[in-house]
Swiss-Prot record:
Protein location: Cytoplasm
Keyword Kinase recorded: yes
HAMAP family: NAD_kinase
Name this protein carries in UniProt: NAD kinase
Lineage: Archaea, Methanobacteriati, Methanobacteriota, Methanomada group, Methanobacteria
Active-site residues (renumbered): D66 (proton acceptor)
UniProt: NAD(+) binding residues: D66, G67, H71, N135, E136, K146, R163, D165, T176, A177, Y178, A179, M180, S181
Primary subcellular site in the record, as a coarse category: cytoplasm
Keyword terms: ATP-binding, Cytoplasm, Kinase, NAD, NADP, Nucleotide-binding, Transferase
Co-factor(s): a divalent metal cation
Organism: Methanosphaera stadtmanae (strain ATCC 43021 / DSM 3091 / JCM 11832 / MCB-3)
EC class (word): transferase
Amino acid sequence: MRIGIISRTDKEEAIELDDTIIKYLFENNIEVELDSQLTKKLPQYSENSVDITKMNADIVLCVGGDGTVLHAQRYLSPKKIPILSINMGTVGFLTEVDPEDIFECLDKLLSYDFFIEERLQLDVLIDSQWHTVLNELVLMTSQPAKMLDLRVSVDEEIVDEVRADGLIISTPSGSTAYAMSAGGPIVDPRVDAAIIIPICPFKLNTRPKIVPADSIITVKFLKEGKKGVAVLDGIVNKEFDYLGEIKLKKSENSAYFVRFKKNFYNSVNNKLIVG
C-alpha cells in the first residue's frame, strides 16, 4: 500500500501530527508520498516530496478541516484516489477521524478493515470553462447591500425567478455546509440529488428545492448594472454580470472517502452540537 499525506500547514498541531503519522508509516514499511507544501515544513522528508498534481497513492491522508479536504479533492477525484480525512479544523463535516483516534484508525487502514464511500460531485460551466465542486456553488453580489436577480431553470423548465442576496446550489455533501446555514435541508449523501437554496430571498414563496442530480440546472442573471461573484467550494472565484449564464450537471468524477463505519446521522448530530 502506498499512502499520501496532504495537510494544512498553518497550524503547528497539524504539522506535529503529520510527523508522528509519517514515522508510524515508515515503522510499518509503508511507501509514503508527501505533498510538496508539507515537506517545506518537514524538510527531513524531502525525498518523499511529490507535487499534489502528481500524487499516485492508493489512499491519501488529509490532515486539516473541510477546506483542506476540498482543496485535495480537486486533484484526487479525477484519479479516483480515496481520502481518509483527519480533523484538524473546526467542525469538519467531511472529516472521518479525530486526532486522538488516529492510530486505531491507521491500524484498521493497514489491515484493510474499511470501506470506500462514493460521493456525488457537480460540474459547473462558467465562462466556457468547466469546474468540479464537491460541496457547492455560491452566487453572491459583489456590491454590498445589493440583491441579485436570477432565473433558475431545471431541464429548460423555469423553476423560479429569484430576488435574493444570493443563491447556493449544493450537493448532498455540501448540505451540511453553507447550504444548511442558509436554511437548506440536511441531505443524506446516498441521495442522488442537487439542492437549490436562495440566500435571504425577497419573496417568501421562494423556497429551497431538491432536484434530481442528473438534471441540467441553468442560472441566468437578469438585471443590468449588477455584478456578482461565483464561488466554487470556497476556493475558486469567478465574476459574472448581466446576461451571464451558469450551467450545472452531475459530474462523471465522484469523490471517494475511506470510512470505518456507517454513522452519517450520528456524526452530523454530534458535530452540530459542537458547532
